[in-house]
Amino acid sequence: MEYMKGPATSSQGNILCCQCGIPIPPNPANMCVACLRTQVDISEGIPKQVSVHFCKQCERYLQPPGTWIQCALESRELLTLCLKKLKANLSKVRLIDAGFIWTEPHSKRLKVKLTIQKEVMNGAILQQVFVVDYVVQAQMCDDCHRVEAKDFWKAVVQVRQKVLHKKTFYYLEQTILKHRLHQNTLRVKEIHDGLDFYYASKQHGQKMVEFLQCTVPCRFKASQRLISHDIHTNAYNYKSTFSVEIVPVCKDNLVCLSPKLAQSLGNMNQICICARVTSTIHLIDPSTLQIAEVDGNTYWRYPFNSLFHPKQMEEFIVMDTEIIRDRKQAAGAGMRSNKHVLAEVWVQKTSEMNTTQQYHCRTHLGHLLNPGDLVLGFDLSNCNLNDEFINKMNPHHIPDVVLIKKSYDRARRQRRRNWKLKEMDRDREGMDTDDERQYQDFLEDLEEDELLRKNVNIFKNANVPVESDTDEEGAPRISLAEMLEDLHISQDATGEEGAGMLTE
């Protein structure tokens, strides 16, 4: 019986390593791996210790030649930055893998494990794993260096208003906070007649100027100063200054218009009250309820000033009122206000209660005033006015008294005010003793003007209890629907204490 033989199996023979003599599978180098590594180091030329620069102030890393980037520890961006440090040396090998080895955050060391391949003797491919140690060295970036040297700003916006109070700047502060335009501001400096906003770039300063032009009537002038010049790269370093001037007219100011401007506004009376200042000046004629708006360009063509300072307002008591109904509108007259009621009133100064002197006038506050109420206004009959337009008017067309607004108990209004406003961090040149009273005047303006509140974020004040409506005396108040919750970082959305923040 014959047995068939199976196919012969071929097996690869071993060879002896030319260095140590141990049997190994054949390879182009005729060496074992251990001897090959002792003879050839494919990581030769790749530095095993490299330095990276880190700015402690802004927590950014330097990416040569002059770029600073934000990278988290063991992030992909930081790994890319570390590999770029070895880019020239890694060009001769093939990078297979790279990753971080964990180190203590305070050790100032970054360790990266690299896996590389390279063709060595006679076409043999050798793979090697090694660690590169990165030493984190502290270096201040140019931006932080300018901050520490107090020479960090590239543009400044100087906002000025030629008035004796700061209510306009309190309003601007709230609108800036609402639109978050203060985030790019390096520094805000408060001086006696305005605010200075400092920026790191000219574009941020231009953005602030555009915002101011949309918020209040103003005009500006731009200038720049050459700081340095590089003759090799033809690079210029400028500092830009934007000087913004706001119109010197505010809410509750009594003004006298020029005859040409009054005629262009619908044959309006020259003596008017500034009811509100937004992007335009809102005027109302207290004797006819005619209203008009004056924008910034029109104001600078036909400028007018306030006849009185707010401190010159006097307190009157209403003796009698009579509503004027069905008043005919003259031909060519402008629009009339639907929120006010025209009335004739007899008033007497509270400082002259022991006399019989009374004043008769027309007012736009007919919907608010009743006999016995207190009202604030200006006495034109017993004052010396120095204004070019009012001096040319017929004295018979000048009223004796102009009433501005109803007076309420200020202490009571402050006590029941259950809301508050945010404030910007700013450097104060000097605190005026009258600043607190001016700030209270601004808060009262917010309570009295609903349209003004639309541009302001109002927050609930949990420390002040809400009074019942039975204590209401008629003073305007802000409803709870208009207030926002004052949510802090340490609270969650339900108002409870949230998780604590991790700090170093």
Swiss-Prot record:
Q: GO CC terms for this protein?
A: cytoplasm; nucleus
Tell me which UniProt keywords the record has, alphabetically. Cytoplasm, Nucleus, Protein transport, Transport
Please list the GO biological process terms of this entry. protein transport; ribosomal large subunit export from nucleus
What are the coiled-coil residue ranges?
none
Presence of keyword Transport: yes
Its main subcellular localisation, reduced to a broad class, is cytoplasm
| UniProt cross-references to InterPro entries, sorted A to Z | Nmd3 (IPR039768), Nmd3_N (IPR007064), NMD3_OB (IPR048898), NMD_SH3 (IPR048899)
What's one Pfam family the UniProt record gives for this protein?
Answer: NMD3_OB
Give a yes or no for keyword Protein transport in this entry. yes
Compartments where located? Cytoplasm; Nucleus
Q: Which GO terms describe its molecular function?
A: ribosomal large subunit binding
Please name the PANTHER family in this protein's record: 60S RIBOSOMAL EXPORT PROTEIN NMD3, NONSENSE-MEDIATED MRNA DECAY PROTEIN 3
Partners and quaternary state? Associates with pre-60S ribosomal particles.
Family designation: Belongs to the NMD3 family.
Described function: Acts as an adapter for the XPO1/CRM1-mediated export of the 60S ribosomal subunit.
Q: What is this protein called?
A: 60S ribosomal export protein NMD3
The protein's organism comes out as Xenopus laevis
